[in-house]
């Protein structure tokens, strides 16, 4: 369900940059179909971006999220980060953001499947936690889910578009009026 981005100058299409952006994001929001309005829930996540972008999340054995996913597994996801440069700027900008959005299909992972352990490890790694073999029995009491998003259904955007993976972390602000060369911004704005 890809829609063209209006502000294409801010679009990030390089897969390595998208992964680096996701690496800096801690929370993902899942939009699930409900009436009269979508049900949006924040979750921590892990991911793998091979042919498709696959997000992994965990949850309890019951709840609203699971009831709604049983009715309609088609979801949207958003992960984002934002910084405000108080008293300064970067390349003439007073703030910066990174966002990744996608549509996909959610599916529960069988606890006996090989993918369950992989998903568990990716989830832990993304959240800066260490895999402990003694946690495996505990993991059998929660659910792990995957959201599979086709690569063409993934969009990413930034206020100051990074050109390299090293530029993905937010740059430190410089005091206003320090004479930065901002001519590239004026050219982009046309």
Tell where the protein language model's regions lie, with residue ranges.
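Short beta-strand segments
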Residues: 25-61, 77, 88
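Short Pro/Gly-enriched beta-strand edge/turn motifs at strand-loop
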Residues: 12-14, 24-29, 127-130
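Catalytic micro-motifs at enzyme active sites that drive phosphoryl/nucleotidyl and oxygen chemistry
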Residues: 32, 87-91, 132-135
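A generic structural signal for nonpolar/aromatic side chains embedded in well-ordered alpha-helices
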Residues: 22, 68-69, 123
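C-terminal edge-of-domain segments
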Residues: 107, 111-190
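Extreme N-terminal tail/first-helix region
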Residues: 1-23, 170-179
């Amino acid at each position: 369900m890809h829609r063209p981005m209006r502000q294409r100058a801010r679009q990030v299409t390089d897969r390595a940059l998208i992964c680096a952006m996701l690496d800096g994001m801690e929370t993902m929001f899942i939009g699930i179909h409900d009436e009269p309005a979508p049900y949006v829930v924040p979750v921590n996540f892990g991911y793998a971006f091979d042919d498709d972008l696959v997000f992994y999340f965990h949850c309890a054995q019951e709840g609203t999220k699971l009831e709604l996913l049983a009715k309609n597994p088609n979801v949207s996801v958003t992960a984002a980060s934002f910084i405000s440069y108080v008293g300064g700027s970067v390349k003439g900008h007073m703030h910066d953001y990174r966002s990744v959005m996608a549509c996909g299909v959610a599916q529960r992972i069988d606890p006996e499947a090989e993918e369950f352990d992989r998903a568990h490890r990716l989830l832990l790694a993304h959240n800066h936690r260490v895999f402990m073999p003694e946690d495996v029995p505990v993991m059998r009491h929660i659910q792990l889910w995957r959201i599979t998003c086709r690569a063409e259904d993934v969009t990413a955007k930034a206020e100051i578009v990074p050109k390299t993976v090293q530029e993905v972390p937010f740059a430190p602000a410089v005091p206003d009026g320090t004479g930065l060369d901002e001519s590239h911004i004026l050219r982009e704005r046309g």
